[in-house]
Design a protein with these regions (language model features):
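Flexible, low-complexity linker/loop segments at domain and module junctions
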Residues: 132-134, 213-250
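Active-site-proximal alpha-helical scaffold in enzymes
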Residues: 1-41, 77-90, 176-197, 244
Length: 250
């Protein structure tokens, strides 16, 4: 086996680095026969700087985050770490598509119409050779802030037309910042490895959906998603957007 040191970096929300490590370095190394495997992931812990920064922006929730509801107090910061092992050898789940974009709209606010997010999603679909209707579930970035949720759903509605099941698992993990990319994607991979995704409803008892958002496709009831192509999105500060598609290996 060939082992190679690739790179170490820090990007907002972690998803961009996870994607870049695979697509710009790790993937080509494997395809060229220069490496047998690539390990990619992220980690983050509670620290004063992000806590104070999000508080200064007015988006730090004092309670559990509630993405896509009419009462979105902001983000709840989580703590986490994860690694993924990608190999040339076939495994139960494969990374079939990825897309990334940088819309450069603002340092901390997403582009209101989600054009950059849409470009990343369409890029992932194109690379995977799939159509929007092939995707059985989308794990939204879904931070629970007003601007992020509105921008992301605008993009998803244009791509998927409300026909694809979607929700945000940050309701349960919080926003793990530098670990968010691997946390969000890892939940999907684990589900595919164990026969499907058992997903709770996006809105728990006492939570009211924000009906000003295009919520078609958002899970209002618990669902069992059969194995198939799934997507995870991460939309970071500075307009750094990524989308990953995983599917069972036939």
């Amino acid at each position: 086996a060939t082992a190679r040191a690739l790179s170490r970096s820090r990007t907002a929300c972690g998803g961009k680095y996870l994607t870049s490590c695979l697509t710009r370095v790790g993937g080509p190394e494997i395809e060229a026969g220069l490496a047998d495997a690539v390990i990619a992931g992220g980690a983050d812990t509670f620290a004063d700087m992000p806590l104070n920064g999000f508080h200064a922006l007015g988006v730090l929730a004092g309670e559990r985050t509630r993405p896509l509801t009419d009462h979105r107090p902001g983000i709840t910061i989580g703590e986490g770490a994860g690694l993924m092992l990608f190999t040339r050898r076939p495994s139960a789940v494969k990374l079939s598509g990825w897309g990334e974009s940088s819309d450069g709209h603002h340092m901390s606010s997403p582009e209101p119409e989600g054009r950059g997010a849409e470009a990343a999603v369409r890029g992932a679909l194109s690379r995977a050779g799939l159509t929007p209707d092939d995707i059985v579930y989308v794990n939204l970035h879904g931070t629970g802030t007003g601007q992020n949720d509105a921008s992301e759903l605008a993009a998803m509605n244009r791509v998927f037309g409300g026909r694809t099941a979607m929700s945000s698992t940050k309701t349960y993990t919080g926003h793990t910042l530098g670990a968010a990319g691997v946390t969000d994607a890892g939940l999907l991979v684990l589900g595919l490895m164990h026969g499907g995704l058992k997903l709770p409803a996006q809105f728990s008892e006492g939570q009211t959906p924000d009906e000003t958002l295009p919520l078609s496709g958002v899970l209002r009831e618990p669902a069992l998603i059969a194995p198939g192509p799934v997507m995870s999105t991460n939309l970071a500060f500075g307009g750094s957007n990524t989308a990953l598609i995983f599917e069972p290996n036939s």
